[in-house]
């Protein structure tokens, strides 16, 4: 499930940054496949945004890494966006907007979370589908995505 995979990717990133994985930053980790989402709430969002939202809390401790999770077809769960980006500031930024990230995750409302943050990945429909990609960029110093993530 996407909500389990997000924290697992945060753990893999922590091990990379600590040097306990056999790799050292700077490095890029690439993952592919398609996770699942058990829909229990009324929210909107797809598996990539749910994965990113689930990674958000543990990612708070990762000052030198950023995660992008996106569908290669450009449409994550029928939302019109490909996915989302998470960095160490995402959790605090969402809380500062008056949102409860745990409630949003419970409501399957990851789309609203990343729309409010402005951290959705917008590609438009790509005309291809080679599953989902998770890209982790880990550096020797803090990594911060530039906004906008992609031109609209």
Annotate each predicted stretch with a short phrase.
Residues 1-53, 57-61:
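A glycine- and small/hydrophobic-rich beta-loop-beta segment
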Residues 53-152:
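Internal helix-turn-beta structural module
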């Amino acid at each position: 499930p996407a909500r389990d995979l997000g924290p697992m990717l945060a753990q893999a990133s922590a091990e990379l940054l600590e040097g306990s994985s056999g790799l050292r930053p700077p490095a890029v980790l690439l993952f592919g496949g398609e996770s699942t989402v058990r829909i229990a709430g009324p929210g909107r969002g797809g598996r990539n945004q749910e994965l990113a939202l689930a990674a958000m809390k543990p990612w708070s401790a990762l000052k030198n890494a950023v995660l992008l999770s996106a569908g290669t077809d450009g449409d994550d769960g029928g939302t019109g966006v490909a996915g989302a980006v998470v960095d160490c500031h995402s959790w605090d930024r969402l809380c500062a907007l008056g949102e409860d990230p745990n409630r949003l995750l419970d409501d399957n409302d990851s789309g609203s979370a990343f729309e409010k943050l402005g951290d959705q990945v917008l590609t438009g429909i790509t005309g291809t589908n080679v599953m989902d990609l998770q890209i982790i960029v880990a550096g020797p110093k803090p990594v911060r995505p530039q906004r906008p993530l992609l031109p609209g």
